[in-house]
Structure formats: C-alpha cells, structure tokens
C-alpha cells in the first residue's frame, strides 16, 4: 500500500517538477493508470489461468521497485513518465493477485481475521508511506530519495512475498474450480 498510495498522492507533484501546466499534469497523471488498469486485468486473468499467486505478486512488485528507481534518475519527462507507468503497472498488477493469497491460506473465522489484519496493516502503510515521502522530499528538496524509498518498499514486498511462497501452504485453486 506504500507504493499504491505513494504514487497516487505524489505522482502529480513529480510531474509538476517538469514545469507543466495543471491541465497537462492531469492528463499525464492519467496515462499510467490507463495502462495499469489494463495490466491489472490481464495479470489477474493470467494468475487465475495457471493457478499461481506468489510470483504473480512478487514479479510485479519487482517491476514497480525497478521502475521507481529508474524514475529517480532525473531523466527527461518522457523517460520519467515511462518509469512511473511501469511502476503503476507493477503495483496494480500485484494488487490484482495479492488479495487472493490470504483466503487461499486461511479459512473460516481465520480468513476473516487474517483479511482484517492484512487490511489494517496495509492501511497503516498507506498512511505512513505518503507522509514519509513528504518528509523526505521536504528534507532533500527533490523527489529522488523519496522515489528510492518507494523502490526500497517494493523490494521489501518482493522479499516478503517470496518468503511467504517458500512456506508450505495448500494448493491455490484455479479460477472456476
């Protein structure tokens, strides 16, 4: 949720650093979400098709982390927009599969409690992440370190997801089973 809320709150500000008008910022901000919404559907469908979840969460998070790091390089607007678009694709593709994990592992009351806990912790990340980005931006005067913070958060997500995949868990059914 750190990346989801981080890109949602701060992408317009990152784009604004290129000196664009508010209308241009608005249009450019919509582009990553257009591609991310398409990727989200396709990636979720692919995960259902082959019945795999862990790597369908970890790989997009890796993409998002690499893209956030790429966007921190101070590249021209077109390159930064490409990087932010890939970051959005990675985040939203991961989210499309992520929510199937707790219910695949937990059942009954445990599933309800597990989903509540995951949602609560995620919302804390959604609260803290954008605030941390703001503090970093204010302290450094640019978004470079803040975007690297987001890259690091995605790397933690990849590691945690891969570690969860190494734990024995019941088979995850394919869609329609």
Locations of the language-model features?
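A membrane-interface helix-boundary motif in multi-pass transporters
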Residues: 21, 134-153
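C-terminal transmembrane helical hairpin of 12-TM major facilitator-type secondary transporters
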Residues: 49-101
């Amino acid at each position: 949720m750190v990346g989801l809320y981080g890109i949602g709150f701060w992408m317009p500000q990152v784009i604004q650093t290129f000196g664009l008008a508010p209308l241009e910022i608005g249009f450019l901000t919509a582009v990553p979400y257009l591609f991310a919404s398409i990727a989200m559907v396709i990636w979720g469908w692919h995960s259902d098709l082959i019945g795999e979840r862990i790597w369908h969460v970890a790989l997009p998070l890796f993409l998002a982390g690499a893209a956030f790091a790429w966007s921190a390089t101070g590249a021209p607007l077109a390159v930064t927009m490409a990087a932010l678009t890939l970051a959005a694709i990675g985040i939203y593709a991961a989210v499309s599969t992520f929510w199937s994990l707790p219910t695949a592992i937990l059942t009954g009351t445990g599933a309800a409690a597990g989903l509540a806990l995951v949602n609560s912790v995620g919302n804390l990340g959604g609260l803290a992440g954008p605030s941390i980005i703001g503090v970093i931006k204010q302290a450094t005067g640019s978004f470079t370190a803040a975007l690297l913070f987001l890259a690091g958060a995605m790397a933690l997500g990849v590691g945690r997801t891969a570690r969860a995949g190494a734990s024995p868990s019941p088979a995850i059914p394919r869609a329609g089973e």
